Amino acid sequence: MSMQTAKTKKITLNHLQAKKNHEKIIAITAYDALFAQMFDPIVDVILVGDSLNMSFFNQNDTLSASLEMMLYHTKAVCMGAKTPFIITDMPFGSYKDEKTALKNAIKVYKETQASAIKLEGGKEKAKLVKTLTNEGVIVVGHIGLMPQFVRLDGGYKIKGKNEEQQKKLLEDALSLEEAGVGLLVLEGITTPIAQVITQKIKIPTIGIGSGKDCDGQILVWSDMLGFFDSFKPKFVREYLKGKELVQKAIEQYADDVKKGFFPNELESYH
């Protein structure tokens, strides 16, 4: 049975947690119904990431993404994808305290069909996570390289290169697990500590730039399909030269129009 026909039921957190130590979790970003529909039969998880602020709106970071933006794109993704577990990124400033976080998480649940919300931060977010999970919100954690902290960190820096960082990462992971996160994203973490975290906690880890030992992997679709050639992170594998292919198609279309080859008789009404 092909991957396209194998999955028919909505994937839940229980399904994903049952995959730990048995089967890798396949995750990808999406921001609209068109791509979500294409990804639907293949992936387990779709993240409506605040990365859309960079890939869709050409911003330098994720910080100006708004809750309204995330709601709009989550609704679109949910219209296209019916099977995957859909996670909505909580944008910068939308979970600055427990009251704000709960209000905005409830708004995501009420206005979209998202399965879960994702927030960045370590053990300092444990109490907030507990508050959300007590109200029935599924929370996905995110530690390591955290894009919402890029200005504080002075850039996008890999974590876990020394013993102090490794200790903090493990403490963060254990605290978040205890607080109730259902999944944990490990971004930009050195492979050895990502492996340790994955072994130590009972919930699945989803890696991005954190080595092959995580319970699953996620990539930004526009990176893996080759739509950005100005910068490519080390961890990205391009499976398609998307930008090149699309530009060639548009060039062919433009040439056909200029030369009067499009539309032809079969493409015209009489």
UniProtKB/Swiss-Prot annotation:
Pathway: Cofactor biosynthesis; (R)-pantothenate biosynthesis; (R)-pantoate from 3-methyl-2-oxobutanoate: step 1/2
Annotated active site: E187 (proton acceptor)
EC identifiers of the protein: 2.1.2.11
Keyword presence, Cytoplasm: yes
Key words of the record: Cytoplasm, Magnesium, Metal-binding, Pantothenate biosynthesis, Transferase
Keyword Glycoprotein among record annotations: no
Main location group: cytoplasm
GO molecular function, one term: magnesium ion binding
Protein name in UniProt: 3-methyl-2-oxobutanoate hydroxymethyltransferase
Source organism: Helicobacter acinonychis (strain Sheeba)
Organismal lineage: Bacteria, Pseudomonadati, Campylobacterota, Epsilonproteobacteria, Campylobacterales
